[in-house]
């Protein structure tokens, strides 16, 4: 997560929902090699290390933000500019003064609050008129939204929704900043309990080579392990056939995909 503090930019880690790892292998999959090239799952990282926040600059940023919110003496006025961010706020029992317009359902507690426009292009006149203390947005839109936020008197944070680990780190951070540690810990524990049980069920089992193909109008892209869905596959025990890329998504030709010989698409 990245936020502005006293005119400087400070790096923080990213952010939510309970993930059903087995869905990666049970929904919308095509098994290409039912008796093929699968290998045994080997745990590579503990839950605690995955969710631990170790960056000292990041920790400092959280402490500064926490102190600033505490000094207000009142609940901060917060705007959430995407459905996912709004869901996070709901889980943390945070009140909002503004929320993005969306065709999807929003948490019941936010049904009557002011809508500020689409996630990709919020109406800054409405945003500014709500006099927010904080604006929370996904980091994928940072390059478009940050210049707009800098024109109004507010703090802002871009939440990294690119991985499950990042989501839960951000839940921890937001819980600390906005005095919602108990709610944040509830979400973390729910995830840990689920994932530890899932890992025990998968001990000694083989894991497939997976290709994550995402359809777009007129084309398609490949999701790598750096994308949110890619992190789900990794946590579920799958091996992404396009591991090693620094990008979230790739455009590749069909011949290259065929040569990867995935077990599951």
Segments from the language model and where they lie:
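Alpha-to-beta junction loops
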Residues: 130-135, 238, 260-265
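Secondary-structure junction motif
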Residues: 143-144, 230
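A short, structured surface patch at a secondary-structure boundary
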Residues: 77-130, 134-140, 241
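Bacterial Sec-exported substrate-binding components of ABC uptake systems
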Residues: 3-17, 28-84, 182-212
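Extracytoplasmic substrate-binding proteins
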Residues: 51-53, 68-77, 144-219, 239-246, ...
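Short helices/loops that flank or line small-molecule/ion binding pockets
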Residues: 124-131, 151-152, 252-261
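Alpha-helical, coiled-coil/dimerization segments enriched in small aliphatic residues
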Residues: 102-106, 221-249
């Amino acid at each position: 997560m990245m936020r502005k503090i006293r005119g400087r930019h400070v790096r923080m880690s990213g952010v939510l929902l309970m993930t059903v790892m087995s869905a990666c292998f049970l929904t919308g999959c095509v098994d290409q090699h039912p008796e093929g090239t699968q290998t045994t799952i080997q745990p590579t990282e503990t839950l605690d290390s995955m969710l631990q926040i170790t960056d000292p600059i990041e920790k400092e940023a959280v402490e500064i933000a926490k102190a600033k919110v505490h000094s207000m003496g009142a609940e901060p006025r917060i705007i959430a500019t995407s459905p996912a961010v709004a869901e996070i706020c709901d889980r943390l029992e945070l009140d909002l003064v503004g929320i993005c317009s969306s065709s999807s359902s929003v948490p019941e507690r936010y049904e009557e609050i002011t809508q500020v426009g689409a996630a990709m292009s919020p109406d800054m006149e409405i945003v500014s008129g709500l006099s927010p203390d904080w604006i929370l947005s996904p980091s994928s839109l940072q390059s478009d939204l940050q210049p707009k936020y800098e024109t109004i008197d507010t703090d802002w944070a871009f939440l990294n929704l690119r991985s499950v680990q990042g989501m839960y780190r951000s839940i921890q951070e937001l819980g600390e900043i906005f005095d919602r540690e108990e709610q944040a810990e509830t979400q973390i524990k729910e995830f840990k309990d689920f994932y530890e049980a899932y890992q025990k069920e998968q001990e000694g089992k083989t894991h497939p080579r997976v290709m994550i193909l995402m359809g777009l109008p007129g084309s398609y892209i490949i999701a790598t392990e750096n994308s949110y869905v890619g992190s789900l596959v990794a946590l579920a025990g799958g091996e992404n056939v396009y591991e090693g890329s620094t990008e979230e998504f790739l455009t590749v030709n069909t011949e290259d995909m065929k040569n990867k010989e995935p077990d599951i698409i």
